C-alpha cells in the first residue's frame, strides 16, 4: 500500500484550481468565437476563437489526471465504503445544489433570450426530457462524470491495489513514448466505438444523459486512472513534472492538427472521431507541459493561492449563468470584442467572488456548494471566561 504523503502537494492543488478557473475565460471567449453557442457576438474574433480552442483542447484531460491522483490518495486513507461516500458527497451535493439554484434559472433565462419559451409546450415528452438533461446538467457535466468514475473505481482501484500487493512496483518503468502509443490506441478505440454507435443508432449520440454518463466517462476515464497511477508510481509522477521538449513540441503539433480538424473537418464525416484521437494524445502531452510548469512555479503555499484553491469550485459553478447573462444583455452594447471580453471577465469574476464571500457566511450554502460538513472548532464550544 502506498503511504499518503504528509506534505500537501501545492502545485497540484494550484493547477486544479486554475484549470477550473480557466472555464471563465473559456466560456466568455466562446461568446466572441466563431463557434455557435447560446449567445454570440455580432462578429467573431479570430484570436479569441484561437484562445478558446487552445483551452478546450487540453483543459479537462489534465483536470481529470489531477482528480484521479487525489482520488487514489483518499482511497488509501479511508475504508472503501467511506471513500466512495466522501467522494460522491463532495461532487454530488454541489451538483444537485447547482441544478435548482443555477442551471434551472439559467435555462429559463435562455428560453426567453432565444425565443423558445412559446414553443416549449409543443415539444414531445422525450424532447423535453433531453433538453432538460442537456441544459440542467450544462457545465456541471464533469461532476456527474466524477460520480460515475468514482463508482467504477470502487472495482478498478481495488484491482490496482491487489495487483500492487503481488508485484514489485519499483521495477515499473514508464516513458512518454510508451504512454503516447497507449493513449493513441485508446483514442482510436474511442473513435471506433463512437463511429460504431453512429452507424448502428445515431440518435443516441444526441441524448444528453448518454453523452455525459457513457461517452464523456469513456473518454476521460484513462486520464483519471493515469492520475491514480501517477500517485502510486513516483517514476511516473517525475516523468510528468520533468520538462520535456519532446512533449512540448508534440503538444504544439497536435494542437495545430486539432485546429486543422476544426477548420476543415465535417461532422457528417470523421471530424469527431479524428478529434478524439488528437485530444487523447494532446491531453497526455499537455499533462507533462502543465505539470512541469506548475511544479516549477506553483509549488508553494500562499494565502492568496489557497483562497482561490478553496473558491475555485464555487466560482466555476456560478460563473456560467453569469457569463450567459453578460452575453445576452451586455455584449450587444459593446462593439469591441476584446473590450467585451475584458469587461466580461471583470463582471463575472467580480460578482462570483462577492457571491463566494456571501455564501461563506451562510453555513447551509457553504455545505451545499462544497459537499463538506461544517465542523465546529473545539474553541467555539468552550465556555467563555
Swiss-Prot record:
| GO annotation (BP), single | glucan biosynthetic process
Q: In which pathway does it act?
A: Glycan metabolism; osmoregulated periplasmic glucan (OPG) biosynthesis
EC number(s) stated in the UniProt entry for this protein: 2.1.-.-
InterPro entries the record matches: Acyl_transf_3_dom, Glucan_succinyl_AcylTrfase, Glucans_biosynth_C
**Domain of life the protein comes from:** Bacteria
**A Pfam family reported for this protein in Swiss-Prot or TrEMBL:** Acyl_transf_3
Membrane topology summary: Multi-pass membrane protein
Q: What is the predominant subcellular site recorded for this chain?
A: membrane
Keywords assigned: Acyltransferase, Cell membrane, Membrane, Transferase, Transmembrane, Transmembrane helix
Coiled coil regions in record: none
Q: Which residues cross the membrane?
A: 17-37, 60-80, 91-111, 137-157, 173-193, 212-232, 245-262, 274-294, 311-331, 338-358
Instruction: Tell me where it resides.
Output: Cell membrane
Q: What class of enzyme is it?
A: transferase
One GO cellular-component annotation of the UniProt record comes to:
plasma membrane
Instruction: Give the Gene Ontology MF terms in alphabetical order.
Output: acyltransferase activity, transferring groups other than amino-acyl groups; transferase activity, transferring one-carbon groups
Q: What does this protein do?
A: Necessary for the succinyl substitution of periplasmic glucans. Could catalyze the transfer of succinyl residues from the cytoplasmic side of the membrane to the nascent glucan backbones on the periplasmic side of the membrane.
Q: What is this protein called?
A: Glucans biosynthesis protein C
Annotated source species: Escherichia coli O81 (strain ED1a)
Amino acid at each position: 500500500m502506498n503511504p499518503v504523503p504528509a506534505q500537501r502537494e501545492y502545485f497540484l492543488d494550484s493547477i486544479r484550481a486554475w484549470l477550473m478557473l480557466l472555464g471563465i475565460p473559456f466560456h466568455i471567449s466562446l461568446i466572441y468565437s466563431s463557434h455557435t453557442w447560446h449567445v454570440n457576438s455580432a462578429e467573431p474574433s479570430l484570436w479569441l476563437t484561437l484562445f478558446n480552442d487552445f483551452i478546450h483542447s487540453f483543459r479537462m484531460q489534465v483536470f481529470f489526471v489531477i482528480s484521479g491522483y487525489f482520488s487514489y490518495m483518499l482511497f488509501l486513507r479511508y475504508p472503501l465504503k467511506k471513500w466512495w461516500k466522501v467522494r460522491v458527497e463532495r461532487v454530488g451535493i454541489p451538483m444537485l445544489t447547482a441544478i435548482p439554484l443555477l442551471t434551472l434559472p439559467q435555462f429559463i433565462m435562455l428560453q426567453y433570450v432565444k425565443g423558445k419559451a412559446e414553443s416549449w409546450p409543443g415539444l414531445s415528452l422525450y424532447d423535453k426530457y433531453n433538453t432538460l438533461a442537456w441544459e440542467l446538467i450544462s457545465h456541471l457535466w464533469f461532476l456527474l462524470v466524477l460520480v460515475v468514475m468514482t463508482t467504477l473505481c470502487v472495482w478498478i482501484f481495488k484491482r490496482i491495489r491487489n495487483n500492487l500487493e503481488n508485484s514489485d512496483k519499483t521495477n515499473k518503468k514508464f516513458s512518454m513514448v510508451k504512454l503516447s502509443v497507449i493513449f493513441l490506441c485508446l483514442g482510436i478505440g474511442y473513435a471506433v466505438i463512437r463511429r460504431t454507435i453512429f452507424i448502428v443508432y445515431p440518435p443516441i449520440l444526441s441524448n444528453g444523459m448518454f453523452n455525459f454518463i457513457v461517452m464523456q466517462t469513456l473518454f476521460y476515464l484513462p486520464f483519471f486512472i493515469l492520475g491514480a497511477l501517477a500517485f502510486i508510481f513516483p517514476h511516473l509522477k517525475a516523468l510528468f513534472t520533468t520538462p520535456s521538449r519532446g512533449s512540448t513540441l508534440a503538444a504544439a503539433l497536435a494542437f495545430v492538427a486539432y485546429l486543422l480538424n476544426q477548420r476543415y473537418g465535417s461532422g457528417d464525416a470523421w471530424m469527431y472521431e479524428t478529434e478524439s484521437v488528437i485530444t487523447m494524445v494532446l491531453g497526455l502531452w499537455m499533462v507533462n507541459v502543465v505539470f512541469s510548469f506548475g511544479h516549477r512555479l506553483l509549488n508553494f503555499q500562499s494565502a492568496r493561492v489557497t483562497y482561490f484553491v478553496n473558491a475555485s469550485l464555487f466560482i466555476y459553478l456560478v460563473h456560467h449563468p453569469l457569463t450567459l447573462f453578460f452575453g445576452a444583455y451586455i455584449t450587444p452594447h459593446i462593439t469591441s470584442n476584446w473590450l467585451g471580453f475584458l469587461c466580461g471577465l471583470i463582471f463575472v469574476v467580480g460578482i462570483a467572488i462577492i457571491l463566494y464571500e456571501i455564501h461563506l457566511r451562510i453555513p447551509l450554502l457553504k455545505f451545499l456548494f462544497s459537499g463538506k460538513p461544517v465542523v465546529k472548532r473545539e474553541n467555539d464550544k468552550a465556555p467563555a471566561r
